[in-house]
UniProtKB/Swiss-Prot annotation:
Gene3D superfamilies reported for this sequence: HUPs (3.40.50.620)
Keywords: ATP-binding, Ligase, Metal-binding, Nucleotide-binding, Zinc
One GO MF term: ligase activity, forming carbon-nitrogen bonds
Alphabetical list of InterPro entries matching this protein: QueC (IPR018317), Rossmann-like_a/b/a_fold (IPR014729)
Residue sites binding ATP per the record: 8-18
Pathway as given in its UniProt record: Purine metabolism; 7-cyano-7-deazaguanine biosynthesis
Family statement: Belongs to the QueC family.
Record-linked HAMAP family: QueC
Documented EC number(s): 6.3.4.20
Name this polypeptide is given: 7-cyano-7-deazaguanine synthase
Annotated positions binding Zn(2+): 188, 196, 199, 202
Native source species: Methanoculleus marisnigri (strain ATCC 35101 / DSM 1498 / JR1)
Its biological purpose: Catalyzes the ATP-dependent conversion of 7-carboxy-7-deazaguanine (CDG) to 7-cyano-7-deazaguanine (preQ(0)).
Length: 222
């Protein structure tokens, strides 16, 4: 059976992504990163639960403490407030972690090469492009070229981004069809008991369920 490394944060997109990879015929090596984010413990708990539910081959957790030293993100620096959702805005949000996906993809590629996996799955999606430069299709394409140049020829490692042209609603719809246990996932940027309900991540998650006429299975504070 084919093998894939799946970046699994424990959030809604990455969990759906792992189920898509499994449904496509891959055995899953779940890769989870901790980097001093506010909801680190909750994300780890959710990612572990999802990996177990998926019967993943392995759950690999890697710490990237350097992101807390780099700073400049409200996810890793508590002195920077997490913005409440206030409609679509231009520019890079405070929750952007500088060049994070390059770090994550580099390590995921290393793991894929070590495990002889044919693919690395990452859940970048349409809504991420405007504010997160390292989620753009052009960035993924450029990173694929780097992977091709910097890894062994066989097996070729392909970066898989099945959500790159999909909205959050499309992702939830796909996940529901695959039986994704969204009650095991976490999206909130700042709380780890009850989701805040006001950060942009909570907003987009809850709106996706609402557009489908469904109630989000996790509890919200507001």
């Amino acid at each position: 059976m084919k093998k894939a490394v799946c970046l699994l944060s424990g959030g809604m997109d990455s969990t759906t992504l792992a189920y898509v990879a499994k449904d496509t015929g891959y055995d899953i090596v779940a890769l989870h990163f901790t980097y001093g984010q506010r909801t680190e413990a909750k994300e780890r708990e959710c990612a572990r639960a999802v990996a177990k539910n998926l019967d993943a081959l392995d759950f690999v957790e890697i710490s990237l403490e350097h992101f807390t030293k780099i700073g400049a993100s409200s996810l890793t620096d508590t002195s920077i407030p997490v913005e409440e959702y206030a409609g679509e805005e231009e520019g890079v949000p405070s929750t952007y972690v500088p060049f994070r996906n390059a770090n994550l993809l580099a390590i995921a590629t290393s793991l894929a090469e070590a495990r002889r996996a044919e693919a690395v799955f990452i859940g970048v999606q349409t809504g991420d492009y405007p504010g997160y430069p390292d989620c753009r299709p052009e960035f993924i394409e450029a990173f694929q070229r780097a992977v091709d140049l910097g890894t062994a020829a066989e097996p070729r490692i392909v970066l898989m981004t099945p959500f790159v042209r999909m909205s959050k609603v499309d992702i939830v719809r796909k996940g529901l069809a695959l039986g994704v246990p969204y009650e095991l996932t976490w999206s909130c940027y700042q709380n780890d008991d009850r989701a805040c309900g006001v950060c942009s991540s909570c907003h987009y998650r809850r709106e996706a369920f609402r557009e489908l006429g469904l109630e989000d299975p996790i509890e919200y504070e507001r």
